[in-house]
């Protein structure tokens, strides 16, 4: 331990009157010593004092405090060293010159031009072992930068305070290191002598090409001397790469850079640490296949995950060239998703289409005929919805079994007849709706059966308004909710669940048949004829549409504000039943809920303009391209193509701005 009265070395400055005596702890990886000095003492004076204790020349000592290397002219007070603080010490190896010291075995550095090696100094090691055994940056012992205990320093606490960039910059500023690194051929040879680098280059020849380029080696050494320049270069490179993807063809350039440079280097590093044992052979083969570089530009748009597989595949087949009949069929098939998409049903149908078991249960399930003993007699004015004519009033005959079987078939879904929920509860409290009805009513089941199934086309038949009440003796179809639930629970579920979801579940069979029938060109031709007829009726006789669709309230704008007709009228003397009564408003609301999706489909068909269909056929290829890009709004795409005269790029810009 040094004492407070210990004299300073020769040539040191006398302490000023306001100087204070402080104690500084000098710590090495293995030793720790305390020194008493004044706070105005310079770093050079402190090194001279420390050199006597550690038996080393002052030029070999490097003092580090707070992550910074202390400079000789600065004082302890200027560096922030106060009483009780610790300064870390690194002892460099002494440099030996050829003329003054006895020669030891010099290191033979292989190189293409040995004469270019700087002659001012030579590289020696303590035990005579060759230096640079691990390359330029790993063999620090041969550069005279370490002491005998330097191998223990990476695990010590000293490295928590060392600023690595500044230390590397100071090392590179050494004249000997600069002269050594200025010879790119020598640096290349030193790197190639490393067995790890040799193995890396054998596995990845691209790295060898980088080492063979003197300009790249020169730039690397320049960046090594100037860390701030390297950081700026990396920042600008990241910015350039981020902007490159937005340039046409930039994605392929990034992919080539990754497959040719980055991917081999990452694979080489992974091989050194061992492969991943959890990677299966399938994953490895997939990675190998996908890592092959693509030499051609990608002209196909990326698939849109939100579009249906059917629509995208149809668009790709259309580019390959098909027959005219197939094009018309594809055009007709692609028109229905736009209609169903407007009312929010297409995605749900696509999900059901992917589950084959549910489709089988919907399309193949038939309702068994009920036991005649369980069938209750019909009321006077009640007519089965699917019968072509109504039986006589008051006959009291039960419903035939053939009619029950027809109603249970999948070709005539239960949605086509009005549900018993409009007029019956658990046991069957019925309202006599037919007594007070005025005027003819609709035959909506027959109309929907024509659209839903081409095999069951029947003529329009006018039946009384009592069609809105179902026959209590007819069993329900499997896809309808069971009648055992109470009306209060069903009403609560209707209020809580979104309205469109209830409509989809109630009217699912018709929509499934619509989707299946779209593949038949004759069915599409019939739908187009119905579409043209609805357009004529909407313009020439709008009130006639209300006769076909009495519960359609959405056509009030078409009819010019005509009054909506009441579909159900309460009887003056209802029969008392133990089950709770269903009010008129509730029955009308439920009737509108069950029938509104089909009427929305009819509105979509009726609102389609023939001129728009011609434009869709004209811009069919462009519309498929826009749909593949993710623009799913058919109307907006068509308007953009009309405004840009079929230019897809201009249409995309217009759609983005809108």
Curated annotation (Swiss-Prot):
InterPro entries: STI1_HS-bd, UBA, UBA-like_sf, Ubiquilin, Ubiquitin-like_dom, Ubiquitin-like_domsf
Residue ranges annotated for the STI1 domain, each copy included: 194-233
Record region (Disordered): 280-336, 362-478
Ranges of Gly residues composition bias in the record: 312-323
Top-rank taxon, per record: Eukaryota
Tissues in which the protein is found: Testis-specific (at protein level).
Annotated S-S bridges: none
Matches recorded under Gene3D superfamilies: 1.10.260.100, DNA helicase RuvA subunit, C-terminal domain, Phosphatidylinositol 3-kinase Catalytic Subunit, Chain A, domain 1
Positions of the UBA domain: 614-658
Record-linked Pfam families: ubiquitin, UBQLN1
Biased composition (Polar residues): 362-379, 389-400, 438-469
PANTHER family, per the entry: UBIQUILIN, UBIQUILIN-3
Descriptive protein name: Ubiquilin-3
Organism: Mus musculus
Gene: Ubqln3
């Amino acid at each position: 331990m040094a004492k407070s009265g210990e004299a300073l070395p020769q040539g040191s400055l006398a302490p000023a009157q306001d100087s204070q005596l402080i104690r500084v702890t000098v710590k090495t990886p293995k030793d720790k010593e305390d020194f008493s000095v004044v706070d105005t003492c310079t770093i050079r004076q402190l090194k001279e004092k420390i050199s006597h204790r550690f038996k080393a020349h002052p030029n070999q000592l490097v003092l580090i405090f707070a992550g910074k290397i202390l400079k000789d002219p600065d004082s302890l007070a200027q560096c922030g060293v106060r009483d009780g603080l610790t300064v870390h010490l690194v002892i460099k190896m002494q440099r030996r010159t050829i003329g003054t010291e006895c020669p030891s075995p010099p290191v033979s550095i292989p190189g293409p031009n040995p004469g270019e090696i700087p002659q001012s100094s030579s590289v020696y090691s303590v035990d005579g072992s060759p230096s640079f055994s691990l390359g330029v940056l790993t063999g620090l012992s041969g550069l005279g930068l370490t002491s005998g205990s330097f191998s223990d320093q990476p695990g010590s606490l000293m490295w928590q305070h060392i600023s690595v960039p500044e230390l590397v910059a100071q090392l590179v500023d050494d004249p000997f290191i600069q002269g050594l690194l200025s010879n790119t051929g020598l640096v290349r040879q030193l790197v190639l002598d490393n067995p790890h680098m040799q193995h890396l280059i054998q596995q990845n020849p691209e790295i060898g090409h980088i080492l063979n380029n003197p300009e790249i080696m020169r730039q690397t050494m320049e960046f090594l001397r100037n860390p701030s320049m390297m950081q700026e270069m990396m920042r600008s490179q990241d910015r350039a790469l981020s902007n490159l993807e937005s340039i046409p063809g930039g994605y392929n350039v990034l992919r080539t850079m990754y497959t040719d440079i980055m991917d081999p280097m990452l694979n080489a590093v992974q091989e050194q640490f061992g492969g991943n044992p959890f990677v299966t052979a399938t994953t490895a083969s997939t990675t190998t296949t996908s890592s092959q570089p693509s030499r051609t530009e990608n002209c196909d748009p990326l698939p849109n995950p939100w579009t249906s597989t059917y629509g995208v595949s149809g668009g790709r087949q259309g580019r390959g060239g098909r027959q005219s009949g197939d094009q018309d069929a594809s055009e007709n098939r692609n028109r229905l998703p736009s209609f169903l998409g407007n009312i929010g049903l297409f995605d749900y149908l696509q999900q059901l289409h992917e589950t084959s078991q549910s489709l089988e249960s919907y399309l193949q399930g038939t309702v068994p005929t009920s036991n005649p003993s369980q069938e209750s007699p019909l009321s006077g004015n009640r007519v089965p919805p699917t019968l072509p004519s109504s039986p006589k009033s008051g006959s009291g005959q039960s419903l035939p079994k053939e009619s029950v079987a027809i109603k249970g078939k999948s070709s005539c879904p239960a949605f086509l007849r009005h549900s018993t929920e409009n007029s019956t509860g658990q046991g069957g409290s019925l309202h006599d709706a037919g007594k007070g009805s005025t005027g003819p009513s609709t035959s909506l089941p027959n109309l929907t059966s024509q659209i839903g199934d081409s095999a069951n086309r029947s003529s329009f038949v006018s039946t009384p308004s009592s069609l809105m009440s179902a026959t209590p003796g007819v069993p329900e179809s499997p896809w309808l909710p069971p009648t055992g639930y109470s009306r209060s629970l069903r009403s609560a579920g209707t209020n809580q669940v979104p309205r469109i979801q209830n409509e989809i579940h109630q009217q699912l069979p018709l929509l499934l048949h619509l989707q299946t029938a779209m593949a038949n060109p004759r069915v599409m031709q019939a739908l187009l004829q119905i579409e043209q007829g609805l357009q004529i009726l909407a313009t020439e006789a709008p009130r006639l549409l209300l006769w076909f669709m009495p519960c359609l309230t959405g056509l009030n704008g078409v009819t010019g504000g005509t009054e909506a007709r009441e579909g159900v009228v309460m009887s003056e003397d209802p029969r008392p039943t133990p089950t709770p009564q269903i009010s008129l408003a509730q029955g009308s609301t439920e009737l509108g809920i069950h029938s509104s999706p089909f009427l929305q489909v009819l509105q979509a068909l009726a609102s389609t303009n023939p001129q728009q269909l011609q434009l869709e056929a004209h811009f069919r290829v462009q519309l498929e391209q826009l749909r593949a890009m993710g623009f799913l709004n058919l109307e907006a795409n068509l308007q953009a193509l009309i405004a840009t005269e079929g230019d897809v790029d201009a249409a995309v810009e217009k759609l983005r701005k809108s």
